């Protein structure tokens, strides 16, 4: 990001942002597996709720901060410097406090430490016997996420849904300036303040998910501590219903400057809450359903939704000084759609798509366990079926003579 801030031309800026995007994708890709390692079934939901809230608050807060920075004497370069400074701070904190979470790696390091102390070189972890070759590396890191994405109905549909949600998140970064700055004549900096509606909505969604955690933990206790993935879908079902309502609300109130700006701003309460509940519980569901390959399932999800996020996003406001915004490659999806169709019908198209996606969490709540039983990757000893097996085992033990 520091290189982006000092770029002299657009080509240099794009190359630097390309590498920034590659390295910035790491936390999003591995967080599911890391949280599966760190947190137990009772606390993982709250941890992912906090993480997801930050994921969505960032894009909504940054236009406000960036808008005022770029409109001040600091200029657009300090928007890049600010991001770089925050990234450097995160690197510093990670280097001090973040430790390895993957059990195989931890045990390998422990075995190596014992060998160094005892000089008994026969001590080793079984994973050290594995020969790391290029083929297995490609299979695990590249092919496995793609297999999960295209061979697992749960991963595919949840990923497509969250990719759409993620795209809408970045689409709002284009739609809000059109509604509030272009249509209503509000200055670019002040025109970012309606994002506060989305910010409050995200916080409401996070609170909704956390409110369902006691219910999930009761189900978890009834299931002998074994995850019940489908119970994660209840807040997602609420979000799936609320989301199209928020989109239609924004579309048909934002299109008319005669309607007070607070009305489309308040639609952010619905869309923000829905975005958070859908995205968050989708991640929780994938982690619970695919515990042993959770990182690969999340990587597949991150891969596809990042494409949607890039495709729905136009050129950031502070980069339009390079005077290349007429390029269809850079306008991509959002700007062209809202200018050609109008806010009302562009938002309605997205609302109808949200209605089409609405049944997904309801279908998996009913049929998810059956699909997981047919899966080659999802553990079969989780969910309601595991509870039945556990109860049968307890009954058999009671019937055995003592």
Region locations from a protein language model:
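Helix-breaking motifs and short loop linkers at transmembrane-helix boundaries and internal kinks
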Residues: 4-12, 23, 39-41, 74, ...
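Hydrophobic core of transmembrane alpha-helices in multi-pass small-molecule transporters
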Residues: 12-26, 34, 233-281
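Cytoplasmic helix-loop-helix junction between adjacent transmembrane helices
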Residues: 16-56
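Intracellular juxtamembrane helix-capping segments at the cytosolic ends
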Residues: 25-40, 277-290, 294, 300
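Glycine-rich segments within core transmembrane alpha-helices of 12-TM secondary carriers
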Residues: 43-73, 78-90, 201-208, 304-312, ...
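Interfacial helix-cap and linker-helix signal at transmembrane-aqueous boundaries
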Residues: 65-74, 97, 180-181, 213, ...
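Intracellular terminal tails of multi-pass secondary transporters
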Residues: 77-78, 86, 91-140, 200, ...
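Extracytoplasmic gate region of multi-pass secondary transporters
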Residues: 140-206, 276-284, 313
